[in-house]
Amino acid sequence: MTPLDAKRPLQLNHLGQLRHFLSLDGLPRELLTEILDTADSFLEVGARAVKKVPLLRGKTVCNVFFENSTRTRTTFELAAQRLSADVITLNVSTSSTSKGETLFDTLRNLEAMAADMFVVRHADSGAAHFIAEHVCPDVAIINGGDGRHAHPTQGMLDMLTIRRHKGGFENLSVAIVGDILHSRVARSNMLALKALGCPDIRVIGPKTLLPVGVEQYGVKVYTDLNEGLKDVDVVIMLRLQRERMTGGLLPSEGEFYRLFGLTTARLAAAKPDAIVMHPGPINRGVEIESAVADGAHSVILNQVTYGIAIRMAVLSMAMSGQNAQRQFEQENAQ
């Protein structure tokens, strides 16, 4: 699918701790579980009168979003603020990049301002890896989504949602439905589910929206929604990403909904206590019926809540790991 994940050792320091968070590929189950456990411990912060812990006090987190995202940007801002960090969000449309400045120059200038961490969202696959390896090696880099490649914090918030509603992964059947081809969320979810021991991972979609070689993720492939949803515990619907499509991959959105839209009738094929998830934004009447999105099976708003806790966990763990790596390198340079 993509060679970018071959660079995964870059994410860990000499102790195996997180120092960047770029992809879920190759990260050990123990580390993913630690992220989930840490996020669980942060959930109660949102219920406090003063929603703050001092873990990143005195640190500066820069959100550098070259792609628009209300949900991801806002939850990263809230996560950093709840950790007591100073937060800067770069509006790329009004920044120097719109005047011809390169990604390299933009981030180098931010690094010179003594930022401690960058959360980067970019349309190009591999952008976060490039930044971590070549641009700002001493700054913790968090991937907020890069092209079709990865969206690791979305993957982890989805895992937290599943674990909190289902208790674990060992006996689950999970279906990921829709535009698999263009979805970095699908890739991150497949990697996370496999690493966490989910025995039955299914991808469902039209042949034109299924990536070549998707089977290498250890998934079962279905092109019939009713068949693929049979007896599943979790249904993860994906947004139809028209902005990334070229050519005639779909005859129409109406035809897609007719064959792959999740309706109350189709959801009946899943287990009675199945949960329905969606990374947002939702296209009602395209990939999901409003009655399902707003119904008793939906945990979509829970995903948003859990996203803040997951991002708090990742920010705090990556900052700690980067600090440990910096200290190790300084001691060995003497």
From Swiss-Prot:
Binding-site residues, L-aspartate: 99, 184, 239
E.C. number: 2.1.3.2
InterPro entries recorded: Asp/Orn_carbamoyltranf_P-bd, Asp/Orn_carbamoylTrfase, Asp/Orn_carbamoylTrfase_sf, Asp_carbamoyltransf, Asp_carbamoyltransf_Asp/Orn-bd
Task performed by this protein: Catalyzes the condensation of carbamoyl phosphate and aspartate to form carbamoyl aspartate and inorganic phosphate, the committed step in the de novo pyrimidine nucleotide biosynthesis pathway.
Family to which the UniProt record says this protein belongs: Belongs to the aspartate/ornithine carbamoyltransferase superfamily. ATCase family.
Organism annotation: Pseudomonas syringae pv. syringae (strain B728a)
GO biological process: one example: 'de novo' UMP biosynthetic process
Chain residues that bind carbamoyl phosphate: 71-72, 121, 151, 154, 280-281
Subunit structure: Heterododecamer (2C3:3R2) of six catalytic PyrB chains organized as two trimers (C3), and six regulatory PyrI chains organized as three dimers (R2).
Keyword Metal-binding included in the entry's annotation: no
Key words of the record: Pyrimidine biosynthesis, Transferase
Pathway annotation: Pyrimidine metabolism; UMP biosynthesis via de novo pathway; (S)-dihydroorotate from bicarbonate: step 2/3
Pfam families reported for this sequence: OTCace, OTCace_N
UniProt-recorded Gene Ontology molecular function terms: amino acid binding; aspartate carbamoyltransferase activity
Catalysed conversion reaction: carbamoyl phosphate + L-aspartate = N-carbamoyl-L-aspartate + phosphate + H(+)
Domain of life assignment: Bacteria
Protein name (database record): Aspartate carbamoyltransferase catalytic subunit
PANTHER family the record matches: ASPARTATE CARBAMOYLTRANSFERASE, ORNITHINE CARBAMOYLTRANSFERASE, MITOCHONDRIAL
One GO CC term on file: cytosol
